[in-house]
UniProtKB/Swiss-Prot annotation:
Entries under PROSITE patterns matching the protein: RIBOSOMAL_S8
Pfam families attached to this UniProt entry: Ribosomal_S8
GO molecular function, one term: rRNA binding
Alphabetically ordered keywords of this record: Ribonucleoprotein, Ribosomal protein, RNA-binding, rRNA-binding
Species of provenance: Legionella pneumophila subsp. pneumophila (strain Philadelphia 1 / ATCC 33152 / DSM 7513)
Example of a GO biological process term: translation
Assembly information from the UniProt record: Part of the 30S ribosomal subunit. Contacts proteins S5 and S12.
Matching NCBIfam families: PRK00136.1
Family of this protein: Belongs to the universal ribosomal protein uS8 family.
Function: One of the primary rRNA binding proteins, it binds directly to 16S rRNA central domain where it helps coordinate assembly of the platform of the 30S subunit.
GO cellular component term of the entry, any: ribosome
InterPro entries: Ribosomal_uS8, Ribosomal_uS8_CS, Ribosomal_uS8_sf
Protein name (record): Small ribosomal subunit protein uS8
Length: 131
């Protein structure tokens, strides 16, 4: 079976892992997934992540999930721009996310939160929203 949206798969694994109270989730790595993980760590949504090379040459990324008083830190994580419907926003159209959340964008200056994009004056593709 081919995977049409690896980012949606990553977000679903995080969501399912937290619902099942897993300490970590592992998935096949890519540069985009690594950058999304970096932003999630910087914003305090995951404890840490690490990348390892498997014997077959592929790289995997393991995300250490974060809990607060036994409850998942991530209340919701949702894919916005998808292969069938890309969503782009200019920095002027970036608004706050309910519940102190962040939108993660792919911009010409790299992967960043909507707050960073607004400060830098760049727009881009809205990958997902996290709160």
């Amino acid at each position: 079976m081919s995977m049409h949206d690896p980012i949606a798969d990553m977000l679903t694994r995080i969501r399912n892992g937290q619902q099942a109270k897993h300490q970590q989730v592992t998935l096949v790595s890519s540069k985009l997934k690594e950058e999304i993980a970096r932003v999630l760590k910087e914003e305090g949504y995951i404890q840490d992540f690490f990348i390892e090379t498997l014997p077959n040459g592929l790289k995997s990324i393991t995300l250490k999930l974060k809990y607060y008083h036994g409850r998942p830190v991530i209340e919701f994580i949702k894919r916005i721009s998808r292969p069938g419907l890309r969503v782009y926003k200019s920095y002027k159209d970036l608004h706050s996310i309910p519940g102190f959340g962040v939108a993660i964008l792919s911009t010409s200056k790299g992967i960043m939160t909507h707050v960073s994009a607004k400060v830098k004056g760049v727009g881009g593709e809205v990958i997902c929203e996290v709160a």
